Amino acid sequence: MNNTTSDINDQRYEPREVEAYWQKEWANDDLYRTNTEVNKENTFYALSMFPYPSGSLHMGHVRNYVITDVLARYKRMKGLNVLHPMGWDSFGLPAENAAIERETSPSTWTDKNISQMKDQLDRLGLSIDWSKEVTTCKEDYYKWTQYIFNQLHKNNLAYQKKATVNWDPIDQTVLANEQVDAEGKSWRSGAKVEKKELNQWFLRITSFAEDLNKDLVTLNDWPDRVRVMQKNWIGKSIGAEITFDIKNSDQKITAFTTRIDTVYGVSYLVLASNHPLIDQLISSNDIDKLNDFRQTQEKLSDLERNSDTRQKLGMYLGVDAINPANNKEIPIWIGDYVIMEYGTGAVMGVPAHDSRDYQFAKSYDLPIQYVIKPNIGEDESYLNAEFVDKGVMINSDKFNGIESDIAKTKILEFGSNSNWAKPKITYKLRDWLISRQRYWGCPIPIINCKKCGQVRVPDDDLPVVLPIDIKLTGKGKSPLTTKTEWINTCCPKCGTDAKRETDTMDTFMCSSWYFLRYINPDNCEKPFLKSEIDKWLPVKQYVGGIEHAILHLLYSRFLTKALKRCGLINIDEPFKKLLTQGMVQAVTFKNPNTNKYFSKDQIKDIDNPKDPLTGENIEIIYEKMSKSKYNGVDPSVVIDKYGADTARMFILFKAPPEKDLEWDDSDVEGQYRFIQRLWKFVINTFKLTNNNSRSNIEKEKSKDEEALRLINIAIKEITDDLDNLQFNTAISELMKVVNGLSLIVNYCSNETLNKVISILVKITSPFSPHIAEELWKTIGNTQSIHLQSWPEFDAGAIEQDTFKLMIQINGKVRGSINASKNLSKENLEDLAIKTEAAIKWMDGKEPKRIIVVPNKLVNIVI
């Protein structure tokens, strides 16, 4: 490396010049290239969730990437071989829509954005190994996404079927259930989602439902919140499947329940509107009514239909079933809250013991039969509403008087012996729908042949490359359906004319395995090497937003398990530790009556804010940074003004990483002042060690010991904080040690000062790499600070020769005094009696006895 940029006499740190210089030096020296000659025990894979290349970083990005970078730098100094890569989640609708709007191609738009964002990332001083870079929209990446699809297809884990799907009318594409929010709107466009029946490709994630659920308990270093969200989404239910005969028919209806103890209270059945039996059972007189009902409910999303607050709609099918437990006839209804894809598409109506069923029964005047009562004697107040708790069986034939929990087992045994019930485990989890009717995605490598059916594109013929010269409109069918010369091809099996699949894959398919490709991104023969995956995976620390708890994180877990089943890898889980960082928030100015946002510049009086249009009161609150809310802060502006190290320090110090961070300009200024203070302290201390006249100044051994004590406390505290991801308290400790050392440096020996400032610069370097590098060279070192070892904690240095001796009179603390640890019991007694506190409270009395607790207290009993 070249020499420092600074003059030893400089009293002010100029971040812009220094940071640009060292970023260039690090790149020229390839400082952060990963050592590939490693063993598993000595590796640390630090990974941030890779970004969509929008063209500009936001503060949420900064927080994510800085957290990961601090860990990467720290682990390198701890002697581990660190992999810290970066890439681009670059397929998807935003690029396609941006290309349409700007009349360019998605690839051109994406390449430009990637170039801009790489520059922005480098300005943050991130220790990224750019030789590991991956871009999901490049052929050398999506070739292997297609290869993985082929492996899944070979193993019966990918299939096509006709399905009613969530259709985004704005983006003109299909959405997975996970991509529809609680209001039935698209997660990306915000459009009201519609229902549509199409041939779609699915991945068989349900084959791994039990493993995905069971293995959550092994993810001890994941946030509980994320594990609970995944557990609820997988939705394992242990219960029974009950078979109901249909009156005057050979047909039967099966329904799943977790409450077989309520079977005697089933007073009706409810079918999903697309249940296959409906069209066989419906009277011709009711077909028009049925069609009207179906059209109404098809406008609802699954989440809306399951909502507890929405009134449930239904219609009587005109046919009855038989309750097998008591042989009573019960009506069969169609209900908009029953979803065919969940369970069997039929549910038991038990209004006495289920809130949703109770609401439905009240709406349509259906019978309500209580079969469980509270275990509280004769109190019948429970009859006024649904009773959903445990209790005692009633109206249940031979099971009356039994506790409901015990009755579950007995009724299931009875039903099994009578052939109308059997044990059953179900999951809410549905297979992953990956078909997308858009251009900018990974083509599905399937060829449709009239003779051979669906045929995989041979692995040797991959990738199926997206056509470049294509007109994008954003409307109607997939743009690929217009490229007949691309669609028309030959069947790989029989050689006859055939057509390519025109759907592309969900972008989450590309982002569910990228962490594997980082290991060998230049490998042209395989997507990854199993032996290398064994060395680096699972990722030791993954950092990203909580919004990916279900989509990306669940899909990545599934694909990892699927690839293991296909024999491609050995690991079961992709990420050992997960940190979900909080949002970065800033002040917003909003009219609560109109929900209109205003910029700070539009508010004339911040102390008494008013809507500039209506004069109404403005609400000032912290919200997630957003352009639409006028509260975004451009990282580039902050770096230009204060430097990257200040931005890094602020983002780390302001809040614990898992908590939301409230942006405050004054706090940024505070970090900038600390950077300047750190600079001056190290420079001035270094000057002291080179001051010849200092040899005449009397040094104090106690000050040397104090300096070493302070720096070793800092080593221990900061090491512990980094191990526990508590970056804010680590930086607080940095500030504390600088303040403490500043008071005593003039009385310390040169040897101690040189040792202390070297350690200080080292423990600063993960947080503020630029100033640390500059200071390291300024104090006379040649090799980069980022190639140094993390300082070892010296426990002996923090042990002091003195301690605070507490003086008690009759068991009550009355004072204290510093005492030597080497004093005998008699010396401590003598010292305690002569203190001002003892003299005052003894008031001339002689002690009856004196109790000494070594290195702690003396209790004088009078």
From Swiss-Prot:
GO terms assigned for molecular function = aminoacyl-tRNA deacylase activity; ATP binding; leucine-tRNA ligase activity
Query: Would the keyword Cell cycle be found if you checked this record's keyword annotation?
Result: no
Alphabetical UniProt keywords:
Aminoacyl-tRNA synthetase, ATP-binding, Cytoplasm, Ligase, Nucleotide-binding, Protein biosynthesis
UniProt entry tagged with the keyword ATP-binding: yes
**Intervals of motif 'HIGH' region:** 51-61
GO biological process per UniProt? leucyl-tRNA aminoacylation
Task: Give me the residues that bind ATP, please.
Answer: K627
Name of the molecule in the record: Leucine--tRNA ligase
Q: Which gene encodes it?
A: leuS
Task: Please state the span of the N-terminal signal peptide per the UniProt entry.
Answer: none
- What Enzyme Commission number(s) appear in the record? 6.1.1.4
Pfam families for this protein: Anticodon_1, tRNA-synt_1, tRNA-synt_1_2, tRNA-synt_1g
Where does the protein end up? Cytoplasm
User: Species name for this entry?
Assistant: Prochlorococcus marinus (strain NATL1A)
- The UniProt entry lists the main location of this chain as cytoplasm
**UniProt motif ('KMSKS' region) ranges:** 624-628
Which GO cellular component terms, listed alphabetically, does the Swiss-Prot or TrEMBL entry include? cytosol
Q: HAMAP family, alphabetically? A: Leu_tRNA_synth_B
